[in-house]
């Protein structure tokens, strides 16, 4: 079941609107984290994306090793 509740990025107001915040007109997002699964099928792709975007604070040699392991 998809979430109906959204939260404004600008003012933090909760709303049912899917497009924009009725209070300030800002963008809205789903405030809940994704469902957890121990058998995570997409973990490899999420880690690879974070590595390529530079969002994981790791050393360069570790990054190179992970990229080599994940792309093979």
UniProtKB/Swiss-Prot annotation:
Source taxon at top rank: Archaea
One annotated Gene Ontology cellular component of this protein: ribonucleoprotein complex
Keywords from the UniProt entry: Ribonucleoprotein, Ribosome biogenesis, rRNA processing
GO molecular function, one term: snoRNA binding
Alphabetized Pfam families for the sequence: Nop10p
InterPro entries: H/ACA_rnp_Nop10 (IPR007264), H/ACA_rnp_Nop10_sf (IPR036756), Nop10_arc-typ (IPR023532)
GO biological process, one term: pseudouridine synthesis
Keyword check for Ribosomal protein: no
NCBIfam families tied to this protein: PRK13130.1
Family recorded in the similarity comment: Belongs to the NOP10 family.
Job description of the protein: Involved in ribosome biogenesis; more specifically in 18S rRNA pseudouridylation and in cleavage of pre-rRNA.
HAMAP family: Nop10 (MF_00803)
Protein's name in the database: Ribosome biogenesis protein Nop10
Organism: Pyrobaculum aerophilum (strain ATCC 51768 / DSM 7523 / JCM 9630 / CIP 104966 / NBRC 100827 / IM2)
Organism phylogeny: Archaea, Thermoproteota, Thermoprotei, Thermoproteales, Thermoproteaceae
């Amino acid at each position: 079941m998809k979430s109906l509740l959204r939260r404004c990025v600008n003012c933090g107001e909760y709303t049912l609107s899917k497009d924009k915040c009725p209070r300030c007109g800002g963008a809205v997002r789903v405030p809940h984290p994704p469902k957890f699964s121990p058998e995570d099928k997409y973990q490899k792709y999420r880690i690879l994306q974070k590595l390529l975007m530079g969002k994981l604070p790791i050393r360069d040699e570790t990054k190179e090793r992970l990229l080599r392991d994940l792309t093979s």
